[in-house]
UniProtKB/Swiss-Prot annotation:
Molecular chaperone that promotes the maturation, structural maintenance and proper regulation of specific target proteins involved for instance in cell cycle control and signal transduction. Undergoes a functional cycle that is linked to its ATPase activity. This cycle probably induces conformational changes in the client proteins, thereby causing their activation. Interacts dynamically with various co-chaperones that modulate its substrate recognition, ATPase cycle and chaperone function. It comes from Ipomoea nil. A motif (TPR repeat-binding) lies at residues 699-703. Residues 677-694 have a biased composition (Acidic residues). The keyword ATP-binding applies. Its main location: cytoplasm. Homodimer. This is Heat shock protein 83. GO terms for molecular function: ATP binding; ATP hydrolysis activity; ATP-dependent protein folding chaperone; unfolded protein binding. The gene is HSP83A.
């Protein structure tokens, strides 16, 4: 084929990342090299989708080749396998850019995944499926013709460069692409008819275009001896003699073998979504899912349904076992639901078809009611599409509930897609209550198991009116939080919301099953006293600590909004709570981590903290006595500042000035170890412990 290239060849270097990828594909041993055929057929199908879509608005686009097909041609003589499609083809610029000089966003991620031990069959998910050809081929030639350009030939042995030549004398395609693989000596199995058929059945049976295989057919023919000694050559192929004589009716008969070639259709299945669900096997769903998504694993769940009535459409939805590497990449358009209109593929990244939070659901929707020539702009206004979307969301939630019936499957699903459900709680007010049923959390009573809100409600203690939760960085960070002390003592269960997105979700999910969701870290936590006597005692305690609260507020100034006696802590000396409508400590941490945050919003939403003190704690009792004896006692001030900074940490906030806090702790240690401050040589560098007073204060030991 290369001999007919009369035009001058241009040589291009592969982009560095693509070169690395090719090197990795060629020099590493992979057991499942067979996936190359799936990838190349999938690319051919995409090219056919594009030209079919273009032809909806301009019929002349199909003039050069009206038939849409994929053809496979094994050539045992030349050891080549060709994949031919009558798709959109590539112009010269596309050829240079798409096959070598511009790396896709997934190139680097795929290499990293491969080096981390991922399966090579993932290649299609990263948009670099073409290069899988080099798993079996030592050289690849791509001949392509686009309607708006001449025919070109791309050729490479993957040695760091490729050539592109204008095809002057080669066989003209009309329109489309022909990929010729020059197979390695140890990969000649892919020229066998049986092997190719098996691979198409396994990976590409549900491609919606006919796949034809150029097959060899041998037939035996009986001729009598008195027919021409020299058998005529049939148009179809060669004839070879079989040395076998047979007497029949007194005449000598001969058998000859006749070899002919023909195109054989090898994907005869009609679109799977048009068949009845009860007729389809589990294996067929798995095969369709893999051909649809390029996933190498089976799906986790499937929902196959049709909607009839005023509006009719059929759909198959799948939930994968894993989240893709770029699930929340905003630059990537989600293209997981393919939209067909009367069996004609229209588009695969229709944002109006499914909400963003369900972007991980893959599948096919085929409608009879949408117009064939629908444009993106029309889709946004289309009422039919809004009804389809509503139905898809409903069916997705049904499918998730079906997964939830199997605990192990649901754990897999929740680990991969819990963020999506929580994003749904935040965005989809209509389905918020249904999505809330799907949430799972660890809690003070669930141990290592996740619990649902429904199960939490069934375990609520008598007299408990609200659902309690705490947000934080991790389960470990919240399970021993001072905020939980009284709740635990009263036997109330508290949910641990330790995912950053929980803060956003719970902000929208105000209640569940008629019960309010109440944060353990915010103001307004009302816990009823067990009896009147206890209530009376608490009131007396509060009264006796009123003066200390005032002194602490004077010392801390505008660091806190107010200081009150706590109802929520039992053992800790104090804690810091936030306003009912402001950010929690955890939300403040999340917002500080946002590089592009609006700082004016931060100052508005990070509400003033309220310091709550525990009247039953020994430290607080001693502090009260000292403050009452001498409210100007400098050790009281130092202790209050130290308690405040410690409470910041235990309540989940960060310190504005960790150095001062460190110095305060060191001072405390010296007192405990009876080290005289005058003797410590490095003390000169220590910051003053009180910001307001310039003079140094010496701490007294607290019993």
């Amino acid at each position: 084929m290369a001999d007919v290239q009369m035009a001058e060849a241009e040589t291009f270097a592969f982009q560095a990342e693509i070169n690395q990828l090719l090197s990795l594909i060629i020099n590493t041993f992979y057991s499942n090299k067979e996936i190359f055929l799936r990838e190349l057929i999938s690319n051919a199908s995409d090219a056919l989708d594009k030209i079919r879509f273009e032809s909806l608005t301009d019929k002349s686009k199909l003039d050069a080749q009206p038939e849409l097909f994929i053809r496979l041609v094994p050539d045992k003589t030349n050891k080549t396998l060709s994949i031919i499609d009558s798709g959109v083809g590539m112009a010269k610029a596309d050829l240079v850019n798409n096959l070598g000089t511009i790396a896709r966003s997934g190139t680097k991620e795929f290499m990293e995944a491969l080096q981390a031990g991922a399966d090579v069959s993932m290649i299609g998910q990263f948009g670099v499926g073409f290069y899988s050809a080099y798993l079996v081929a030592e050289k690849v030639i791509v001949t392509t013709k686009h309607n708006d350009d001449e025919q070109y030939i791309w050729e490479s042995q993957a040695g760091g460069s490729f050539t592109v030549t204008r095809d002057v004398d080669g066989e003209q395609l009309g329109r489309g692409t022909k990929i010729t693989l020059f197979l390695k000596e140890d990969q000649l199995e892919y020229l066998e008819e049986r092997r190719i058929k098996d691979l198409v059945k396994k990976h590409s049976e549900f491609i919606s275009y006919p796949i034809y295989l150029w097959t060899e057919k041998t037939t035996e023919k009986e001729i009598s001896d008195d027919e021409d000694d020299e058998p005529k050559k049939e148009e179809e192929g060669d004839i070879e003699e079989v040395d076998e004589d047979k007497e029949k009716e007194g005449k000598k008969k001969k058998k000859i073998k006749e070899v002919s070639h023909e195109w054989q259709l090898i994907n005869k299945q009609k679109p799977i979504w048009l068949r009845k669900p009860e007729e389809i096997t589990k294996e067929e769903y798995a095969s369709f899912y893999k051909s649809l998504t390029n996933d190498w694993e089976d799906h986790l769940a499937v929902k196959h349904f049709s909607v009839e009535g005023q509006l009719e459409f059929k759909a198959i939805l799948f939930v994968p076992k894993r989240a893709p590497f770029d699930l929340f990449d905003t630059r990537k358009k989600m293209n997981n639901i393919k939209l067909y209109v009367r069996r004609v593929f229209i588009m695969d990244n229709c944002e109006e078809l499914i909400p963003e939070y369900l972007g991980f659901v893959k599948g096919v929707v085929d409608s009879d009611d949408l117009p064939l020539n629908i444009s993106r702009e029309m889709l946004q206004q289309n009422k039919i599409l809004k009804v389809i979307r509503k139905n898809l969301v409903k069916k997705c939630i049904e499918m998730f509930n079906e997964i939830a019936e199997n605990k192990d499957d649901y754990n897999k699903f929740y680990e991969a897609f819990s963020k999506n459900l929580k994003l749904g709680i935040h965005e989809d007010s209509q389905n918020r209550a249904k999505l809330a049923d799907l949430l799972r959390y660890y809690s003070t009573k669930s141990g290592d198991e996740l619990t649902s809100l429904k199960d939490y409600v069934t375990r609520m203690k008598e007299g408990q009116k609200d659902i309690y939760y705490i947000t934080g960085e991790s389960k470990k960070a919240v399970e021993n939080s001072p905020f939980l002390e009284r709740l635990k003592k009263k036997g109330y269960e508290v949910l641990f919301m330790v995912d950053a997105i929980d803060e956003y979700a719970v902000g929208q999910l105000k209640e569940y099953d008629g019960k309010k969701l109440v944060s353990a870290t915010k103001e307004g936590l009302k816990l009823e006293d067990d009896d009147e006597e206890e209530k009376k005692k608490r009131e007396e305690k509060k009264k006796s600590f009123e003066n200390l609260c005032k002194i602490i507020k004077d010392i801390l100034g505008d660091k806190v909004e107010k200081v009150v006696v706590s109802d929520r802590i039992v053992d800790s000396p104090c804690c810091l709570v936030t306003g009912e409508y402001g950010w929690t400590a955890n939300m403040e941490r999340i917002m500080k981590a946002q590089a592009l945050r609006d700082s004016s919003m931060s100052s508005y939403m990070s509400s003033k903290k309220t310091m709550e003190i525990n009247p039953d704690n020994g430290i607080m009792e001693e502090l009260r006595k000292r403050a009452e004896a001498d409210k100007n006692d400098k050790s009281v001030k130092d202790l209050v500042l130290l308690l405040f900074e410690t409470a910041l940490l235990t309540s989940g906030f960060s310190l504005d000035d960790p150095n001062t806090f460190g110095a305060r702790i060191h001072r405390m240690l010296k007192l405990g170890l009876s080290i005289d401050e005058e003797e410590a040589g490095d003390d000169a560098d220590m910051p003053a412990l009180e910001e307001e007073a310039g003079e140094e204060s010496k701490m007294e030991e607290v019993d």
